[in-house]
Each structure stands twice: as C-alpha cells, then as structure tokens.
C-alpha cells in the first residue's frame, strides 16, 4: 500500500477495510511493484546475481560434482590415453592437428575477437561489439590464469623424457603441461559466445574439441591438463558474462536498478 492510502477500521465489526483516498495511476503502479516484488521473494526467484540466486545453487552444486568426477577420471586415464594416441599416430593426422593447434593459440583468438568487434562497431551493432569484446576479455583472463598455474605446478609434458630434466624447469615450456593454455583460451573465448547466443556457440563447439584433441595428439598435454583447462575456461566465461553481458541479457532489470 502506498503512502497516499490510509487504513480505516469500520465501526462495530472489527474488520479492517482499506480505502484509497488518492486513487491515481502512480498509486496503482506502486502497489503493483510491491506485490510483484513480494511474489518474487516468496517464490525464491530474482532478476539479480547469477552467483547468489537461489535457483542457481542446484546447478552450481551439480557442476561441481560433474567437474570433480571429470577431473578424477581424467587423471586416472592420463597415461593410458597418451600411450594409445602415440601407438596410433600417423603422419596425415599429425600434420592436421599441428595446424589446428596453431589456430588454437591465444594470439589468433585475440586478433579474431578484435576484428569481429571492429566489424560490429562499423555496422553499428553495439550488442555484438560488446559480446566480441567480452570474448577477448574472457580469453585474457583464462590465458593469464593458465600461465600462472603452469609456472606454479611445473608439470612435465608427455613428450618430456627423464633425461631431459632441466635445472630451471619451472620456467621452461617443456614443464608447462598443466593446464593447457590453448584449451583454456578457446573454451573461454567460445564459451562467452555460447552463453550469449547458444546456437552460434554450439556451431563453434567442434573448434574447441579439435583444439583439445590436437593438444593430446601432439603429446603436449595429458587428458587431465585438457579437462582442467576446459573448466578454467568455462569459469572465465561465466565470470565475464556475469559482469559484462548482464545488462544485455536482462535489459529490464538494468533499467529498474
């Protein structure tokens, strides 16, 4: 009830009747917004934060469980998958995966994102300009995070032999297996695209899968390196979408807030 409305007790009955002394469109709109907010609170829904909304808690817990199982399974099959790919290697597929992994590096994604953002700006499409720039930001976050983790973990690549151990292995690229920077960057890059437009993002999903396979086939990473990098890329994409694309996805809530 708005401030212009006043409660009035009817004599002799004890029941409360409500009377609007100032009936106006503004008064009705205020009452409608109040009742709508109460309904959203009662149902546990809101237009707000992706990370604290009650309805998303279940999906976060489910995602944590799936990620934990995937990482544990990947570590278990690390050696077996690497040995299988080495035994079934051929020259044609090796050359193909070599060129795929060249495209999957972060400079190519970075340049592609900036070019697409420039094209969208030239065409006056602010929405897609913001999406492409968000893809670049997610790529940068995932790439930097992966590189820092690489230095801290210093895991040897599958192709590294024991006799090649180096005194400064922590800063050598031969010991930067965990996690895969290529997979983290491509997952974050196309992950933002999938969250912004799932049809276009789904069409680009084979690119991410090919990049991940190429890193395994070239003995640059173990299976666990690729799986953990994909999780890092997904988290980077979710973070960027939440902070940079939320006004696009929820324009009405952005206006009201």
Put a short name on every predicted segment.
Residues 80-83, 125-195, 200:
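Membrane-interface loops
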Residues 2-5, 27:
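Cysteine-centered motifs
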Residues 40, 53-54, 60-61, 165-257:
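Membrane-embedded catalytic cores of phosphoryl/pyrophosphoryl-handling enzymes
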Residues 68-74, 140-145, 208-220:
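Aromatic-anchored segments of alpha-helical transmembrane domains
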Residues 10-42, 57, 248-257:
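Short, basic, low-complexity termini and linkers enriched in Ser/Thr/Gly/Pro
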Residues 37, 44-113, 150-172:
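N-terminal transmembrane-helix/juxtamembrane module of multi-pass inner/ER membrane proteins
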Residues 111-120, 186-194:
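Hydrophobic, aromatic-rich transmembrane alpha-helices
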């Amino acid at each position: 009830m708005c401030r212009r409305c006043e409660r009035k007790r009817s004599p002799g009955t004890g029941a409360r009747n409500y009377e609007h002394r100032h009936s106006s469109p503004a008064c009705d709109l205020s009452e409608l917004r109040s009742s709508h907010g109460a309904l959203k609170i009662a149902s546990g829904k809101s237009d707000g934060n992706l990370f604290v909304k009650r309805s998303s808690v279940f999906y976060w817990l489910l995602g944590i469980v799936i990620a934990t199982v995937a990482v544990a399974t990947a570590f278990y099959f690390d050696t077996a998958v690497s040995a299988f790919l080495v035994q079934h290697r051929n020259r044609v597929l090796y050359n193909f995966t070599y060129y795929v992994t060249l495209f999957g590096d972060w400079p190519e994604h970075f340049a592609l994102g900036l070019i697409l953002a420039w094209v969208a700006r030239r065409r006056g499409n602010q929405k897609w300009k913001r999406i492409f720039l968000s893809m670049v930001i997610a790529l940068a976050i995932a790439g930097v995070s992966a590189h820092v983790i690489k230095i801290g973990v210093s895991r040897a690549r599958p192709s590294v032999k024991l006799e090649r151990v180096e005194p400064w292995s922590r800063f050598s690229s031969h010991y930067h297996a965990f996690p895969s920077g290529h997979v983290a960057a491509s997952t974050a890059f196309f992950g933002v695209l999938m969250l912004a437009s799932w049809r276009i993002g789904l069409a680009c999903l084979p690119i991410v899968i090919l990049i991940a396979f190429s890193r395994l086939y070239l003995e640059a990473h173990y299976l666990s390196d690729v799986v953990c990098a994909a999780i890092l890329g997904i988290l980077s994409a979710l973070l960027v979408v939440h902070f940079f694309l939320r006004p696009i996805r929820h324009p009405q809530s952005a206006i009201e807030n």
